[in-house]
Amino acid sequence: MLDKSQLSADIAKSNQDAEIAKFDALAQEWRDPNGKFKHVLAFNSTRLMAIENAIAVHFQRDLNQDIPFQGLNILDIGCGVGLLCEPLASQGADVTGIDASGHNITLAQRHAQKWSIKVDYKHCLAQDLIGNEPQYDVVLNTEVIEHVDDQQLLVDTCCRLLKPSGLLVMATLNRTLKSYIVGIIGAEYIMKYLPKGTHDWNYFVKPQEITSMIAPHGLETITVEGMSFNPLTGQWKITDKPDVNYLLYALKTTD
């Protein structure tokens, strides 16, 4: 006699295995330097290097050490598939990555498990962490604010989650004519690096606006770095011109 419960269990397990395999493949695809996300990976590589250097300078750490960020608690808000979380965790930091997309968190978790990298991934919003009042040495908010309606709330939350003397890193796009031409017309319509409609120029944020938003929380902007893309080489570099993509670093001076 056919055991329908066993059959259902076998089908469920088969479906689950297929889903796991799909997520594993997607997680790996996100890290293929020659795959469809190669432009994102090139951008992330330069951004990561800049962030690592900023953390090392701020906390007086030597990047030549095996685990230079040991003892630091880092929060990545809008972590995506963990492109920043994993390398920072591999350098000794205790990393928490949160994202509003459960799909992203699943991909990140699968990849971290595969390579035995310890990251605490959570499917939640930044505001969801406020009740427990955890505080972090470093709070990262990269390429998120330009997609958020209540930008002030997001910045307020970032500041509240940061320890005194901690480092806030905000990465986004400046609201300039050049950013419209390069970041939207060029990236989305001409070069097609991003899907059309990825960005709304009206949501881009000027560095001085972030500086004003963080000031009531006792944060001061330390420096602002620009990021520039060379379409001929496909490479990004750090510049002193934050007129399109930029990174803003801020110090929390008070409780």
Task: Identify the function of each model-found stretch.
Residues 62-177, 207, 248-252:
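Conserved SAM-binding loop
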Residues 219-230:
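Conserved S-adenosyl-L-methionine
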Residues 192-209:
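Acceptor-substrate binding/catalytic loop of class I
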Residues 1-37:
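N-terminal, positively charged/glycine-rich alpha-helical extensions of SAM-dependent methyltransferases
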